[in-house]
């Protein structure tokens, strides 16, 4: 009995080491997911698709809707920080519009366009939450679906890049622009579409200049990403132990840092480059994911 009792501290140490190892592994996993989220949320290549495919490639499995939606909060912190001056001007414009009726003022019109553009994805998201309880496990989130959608969106972006007139600028935005791009944003609820990809494609089709299109799409995404993260926040934390909070925070912080870099890079890149690099990437991504699935190695 004494020998067994003397091994108590050893067992405690082993349990502590196992728990620490598990915590470090979870932090590493969420660090990688945060980097993937940050790189893909604002580039037109679909963060949802990459957050499903990358973990499966390394044997982690699908992290699920709740976890990825919460990690997306890091991206929203980044976009708010990056566009804080723009947001302040929009809020100021809206306040003046309500006070003096100056709805023709550019910042007021931009705020109105963002509000109108948020409604389609808000209503569609609520409908999925209420009437499609099996969405997370549905075939729409399967690898072949993601691959095909990625290829289709690549072709649409190619058409928009080729035939869009690229005349509109940010100061010309109207509520109608918000509605058109907002409808495209709602399509991002389909994994593989890409919120930034669908909105950028719609903006280019609608005649926006590339950099202003990207800027508007980023601002339009703020309410959508925020609401998605907050809706899933309660469910995600309900499933977590105390030790699970730290990995989630690691994911959020890494997503915020990388998202800021991605936003800054894309806006500068589109000043003098087209979106063809993303067309090629999405085609290759879709083809490779489809080939991976057909090979049977994804099971």
UniProtKB/Swiss-Prot annotation:
Specify the protein name.
Undecaprenyl-diphosphatase
**GO MF annotation, one:** undecaprenyl-diphosphatase activity
Q: What else is known?
A: Bacitracin is thought to be involved in the inhibition of peptidoglycan synthesis by sequestering undecaprenyl diphosphate, thereby reducing the pool of lipid carrier available.
> Is Protein biosynthesis among this UniProt entry's keywords?
no
Question: What family classification does the UniProt entry report for this protein?
Answer: Belongs to the UppP family.
Signal peptide boundaries: none
Cross-referenced InterPro entries, in alphabetical order?
UppP
Where is it mainly found?
membrane
Instruction: List the coiled-coil residues.
Output: none
Lineage of the species this protein comes from = Bacteria, Bacillati, Cyanobacteriota, Cyanophyceae, Synechococcales
Q: What does this protein do?
A: Catalyzes the dephosphorylation of undecaprenyl diphosphate (UPP). Confers resistance to bacitracin.
| Membrane-topology annotation of the record | Multi-pass membrane protein
Q: Where found, per UniProt?
A: Cell inner membrane
**Where does the source fall among the domains of life?**
Bacteria
Q: Which UniProt keywords apply?
A: Antibiotic resistance, Cell inner membrane, Cell membrane, Cell shape, Cell wall biogenesis/degradation, Hydrolase, Membrane, Peptidoglycan synthesis, Transmembrane, Transmembrane helix
GO biological process terms held by the UniProt record: cell wall organization; peptidoglycan biosynthetic process; regulation of cell shape; response to antibiotic
Q: Which reaction does this chain catalyze?
A: di-trans,octa-cis-undecaprenyl diphosphate + H2O = di-trans,octa-cis-undecaprenyl phosphate + phosphate + H(+)
According to its UniProt record, the EC number is 3.6.1.27
Q: Which residues cross the membrane?
A: 10-32, 63-83, 112-132, 143-163, 178-198, 213-233, 243-263, 276-296
